[in-house]
Amino acid sequence: MTTSSYFLLVALGLLLYVRQSFSTHEHTCQLDDPAHPQGKCGSDLVNYHEEKCEEEEARRGGTNDGGKKRRRASPLRKRRRFISMLKARAKRRGYQGIACECCQHYCTDQEFINYCPPVTESSSSSSSAV
């Protein structure tokens, strides 16, 4: 085996390893896949995801500050954005994401929290400065 083909083989193996290491989705779904009996779909998925994200945000820094709540996006706007994201993903042939992970399959609460936007330090520090 020549040095260049050996190098190519090692590079491809490393690339495959990195791809699998950074993949956060466990499943790939098709549009005709049935929903899991315990999966959350549609508005149930949106409501449960929003609830878990708010609980996680409160656990990490609290959301009792009225000023902070006013600066957050309205729940209706967040819901519309989330639903449009789900529709865009559903148009693909094979898709991954929260709809695949938590509707066609079952998600734990921790898996739902993994789909929440990160709590930024600026929002935590601004609430302490008010």
Swiss-Prot record:
Disulfide bonds join C29-C100, C41-C103, C53-C116, C102-C107. CDD domains: IlGF_like. Residues 59-92 form a propeptide. Residues 1-23 form the signal peptide. The modification 4-hydroxyproline is found at P34. Expressed by the venom gland. Keywords: Carbohydrate metabolism, Cleavage on pair of basic residues, Disulfide bond, Gamma-carboxyglutamic acid, Glucose metabolism, Hormone, Hydroxylation, Secreted, Signal, Toxin. The keyword Disulfide bond applies. InterPro entries: Insulin-like_sf, Insulin-rel_pep, Insulin_CS. Residues 68-77 have a biased composition (Basic residues). Residues 54-77 are annotated as: Disordered. It is found in: Secreted. GO terms for biological process: glucose metabolic process. One of its GO terms (cellular component) is extracellular region. The modification 4-carboxyglutamate is found at E111. GO terms for molecular function: hormone activity; toxin activity. Heterodimer of A and B chains; disulfide-linked. Belongs to the insulin family. Venom insulins constitute about 1/25 of the total venom of C.geographus. This venom insulin, from a fish-hunting cone snail, facilitates prey capture by rapidly inducing hypoglycemic shock. Intraperitoneal injection of this peptide into zebrafish lowers blood glucose with the same potency than human insulin. In vivo, when applied to water, this peptide reduces overall locomotor activity of zebrafish larvae, observed as a significant decrease in the percentage of time spent swimming and movement frequency. This is Con-Ins G2b. It comes from Conus geographus.
